[in-house]
């Protein structure tokens, strides 16, 4: 899995050199931000269920047809609602993985690579998940550097869906 740290090490190793001062400063900066990232990951994990439930409700309010139309991709049945919550949870989990890893590697490898194919195969609208992620971003309760770190990965997911 790629992270800024592993990429810097791989580049230096490929070139048979030590890390440059610039690369070392970047790694040092990452370690300083790691405390805030871990705080954010813990908070998102501890509040995951309420964030997921709230995000699902935000989707249903913005796109009310999702709760009335029939089909496995809609939330008109308890099973459909459970699938919606599961999918929102997957996006939130990816954000926490990125926070722990310190880069977008987990999202790039486990989510974005097949995102458009999954959405088209199952007739899922990216706008549903964008709305869910916007809700999570607006309601996660994080402040300071922890919010900055979490919001960066939430925005990354939103941009990937756009």
From Swiss-Prot:
Residues that coordinate or bind (2R,3E)-phycocyanobilin: 84
Record Pfam families: Phycobilisome (PF00502)
A GO-annotated cellular component: phycobilisome
Location(s), subcellular: Cellular thylakoid membrane
Disulfide bonds: none
Database matches in InterPro entries: Globin-like_sf, Phycobilisome_asu/bsu, Phycobilisome_asu/bsu_sf, Phycocyanin_a
Any one GO biological process: photosynthesis
Domain of life according to the entry: Bacteria
Post-translational modification (record): Contains one covalently linked phycocyanobilin chromophore.
Keywords assigned: Antenna complex, Bile pigment, Chromophore, Electron transport, Membrane, Photosynthesis, Phycobilisome, Thylakoid, Transport
Its membrane topology: Peripheral membrane protein
Major localization listed first in the record, in broad terms: membrane
Family named by the database record: Belongs to the phycobiliprotein family.
Described function: Light-harvesting photosynthetic bile pigment-protein from the phycobiliprotein complex (phycobilisome, PBS). Phycocyanin is the major phycobiliprotein in the PBS rod.
Assembly behavior: Heterodimer of an alpha and a beta subunit, which further assembles into trimers. The trimers assemble into hexamers.
Protein name (database record): C-phycocyanin alpha subunit
Encoding gene per record: cpcA
């Amino acid at each position: 899995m790629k992270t800024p740290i592993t990429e810097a090490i791989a580049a230096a190793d490929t070139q048979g050199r030590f890390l440059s001062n610039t690369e070392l400063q970047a790694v040092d900066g990452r370690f300083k931000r790691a405390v805030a990232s871990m705080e954010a990951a813990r908070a998102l994990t501890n509040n995951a269920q309420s964030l997921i439930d709230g995000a699902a409700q935000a989707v249903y309010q913005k796109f009310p047809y999702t709760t009335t139309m029939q089909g496995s991709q809609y939330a008109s049945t308890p099973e459909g609602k459970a699938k919606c919550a599961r999918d929102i949870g997957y996006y939130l989990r990816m954000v926490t993985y990125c926070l722990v890893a310190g880069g977008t590697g987990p999202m790039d490898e486990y989510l974005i690579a097949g995102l458009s194919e999954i959405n088209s195969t199952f007739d899922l609208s990216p706008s549903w998940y964008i709305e869910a992620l916007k809700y999570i971003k607006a309601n996660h309760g994080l402040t300071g550097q922890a919010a900055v770190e979490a919001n960066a990965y939430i925005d990354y997911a939103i941009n990937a869906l756009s």
